[in-house]
Regions:
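Active-site entrance/lid segments in N-terminal catalytic domains of soluble metabolic enzymes
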Residues: 1-216
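Conserved active-site-proximal phosphate/metal-binding subdomains
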Residues: 81-98, 202-222, 228-376
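Glycine-rich Rossmann-fold phosphate-binding loop(s) that bind the pyrophosphate
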Residues: 17, 224-225
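Residue-level detector of alpha-helix initiation sites
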Residues: 152, 227-228
Length: 376
């Protein structure tokens, strides 16, 4: 399973794990992969605490940080401080959206304590809020990769990260976006197929991956969207990718912050139980279909706002997901890909890595046997 990217980053397997849980970051990197901590939702102070903890527990291994700077969002042209931008965006959020969201949660028995529900907070989603996160991440020597989940990072940010001796990655959903990343100097492009969890495009992985590989060669490409087994990693590498970027699987490990009730929801779900919805972030995001996503699709309810305004509304549901995980299942923010249909049990992180490696070997041995039988 070793690719040139493994030597580049000093890892054993080209398995990249996106997660918001620091324990999973550490467990993946210690098992030979590369853990990546999602920074959205963390204040600068909270992010510093998380990264310090990772540094203390990860040993000599390396990890990355994922930020979100969309190429289009409300207020992106405003030249102002983070505080002023937050105030401007808060004033743009209609009260009817906040009232609707709060009622939806309350109707499902989920408390929304005044001042503690995370509404109207701007915890990421803009260059102004992501820049401090990058600066904090760069203060940690074991942090060797910054990934942008939406769009091409600003040129000065790419230059700054490179000057600090770190690499830059960015997700894409089309060859056009991949070309923009490569031309800007991004080191690694992550091709996210439409079946992936979280923000994704409409093109399926098996179609997208080779298109992106061809478009930006020799820039290394990571395959994302539909990665839940070693056989799927084998398919990605066969299509020219140098590794796999995964997210959904790490919701189903023992080190995850998810409760058994939340994980049971994933086990019971099928691949057709996910939906691309704008109801949480303002951009199409694949997640489990539930009462929250259904409510925002109704013709007699408010339309989702653009990014980051919608998240300033849905933040109360995200906060409830963490504070009252078992009570909020029907209205929770559950970004997950169609690969959810493969989940059967909760495993240790190291066991997942080991299983994927063995499944990869089985898949490649199967192809070798076919070739041998054909006299190739």
């Amino acid at each position: 399973m070793r690719t040139p990217l493994c030597d580049d980053l000093g890892i054993e397997f080209p398995i990249f794990a996106f997660t918001h849980c620091r324990d999973v970051v550490v467990a993946v990197s210690k098992a030979g992969g590369f853990g990546v901590l999602g920074a959205v939702g963390f204040s600068p102070e909270q992010l510093e605490i998380e990264l310090n903890w990772i540094d203390e527990h990860i040993g000599d291994h390396r990890y990355g940080v994922d930020i979100v700077i969309p190429n289009k969002y409300e207020g992106m042209d405003a030249d102002m401080s983070t505080e002023d931008l937050t105030k401007m965006l808060q004033d743009m959020v209609p009260q009817q959206h906040l009232a609707f969201a709060r009622k939806l949660l309350n109707d499902h028995g989920v408390p929304t304590p005044e001042g503690e529900d995370n509404s109207l907070k701007l915890l990421g989603w803009t260059e102004a809020t992501a820049t401090p996160q990058v600066e904090i991440a760069l203060r940690h020597p074991k942090m060797t990769l910054i990934a942008n989940a939406l769009g091409t990072p600003p040129p000065d940010m790419i230059e700054h990260i490179h000057a600090e001796g770190r690499k830059v990655a960015a997700l894409c959903g089309s060859p056009y976006q991949a070309r923009k990343h490569a031309d800007a100097g991004v080191d690694i492009v992550i091709a996210q197929g439409g079946e992936g969890g979280g923000h994704c495009g409409e093109v399926g992985s098996v179609v997208l991956w080779p298109q992106v590989v061809k478009e930006i060669a020799p820039v290394p490409v990571l395959a994302a969207g539909g990665i839940g087994s070693g056989a799927q990693i084998a398919a990605a590498l066969a299509l020219g990718c140098q590794g796999a970027w995964s997210g959904s699987q790490w919701l189903m490990v023992e080190e995850s912050e998810n409760t058994p009730v939340q994980q049971d929801t994933y086990i019971k779900a099928g691949s057709r139980d996910t939906v691309r919805s704008r109801s949480f972030t303002g951009k199409p995001c694949r997640m489990l279909r539930n009462d929250w996503t259904e409510a925002w699709e109704s013709p007699d309810t408010p339309d989702p706002l653009g990014m980051p305004l919608q998240y300033m509304v849905s933040g109360m549901a995200v906060a409830a997901t963490h504070r009252y995980p078992d009570q909020s299942v029907d209205v929770a923010f559950n970004p997950v890909g169609q690969v959810v249909g493969q989940f059967e049990k909760v495993e240790k992180t190291a066991a997942v890595i080991e299983r994927w490696v063995n499944e990869y070997l089985e898949a490649t041995e199967h192809l070798d046997a076919l070739n041998a039988a054909a006299g190739v």
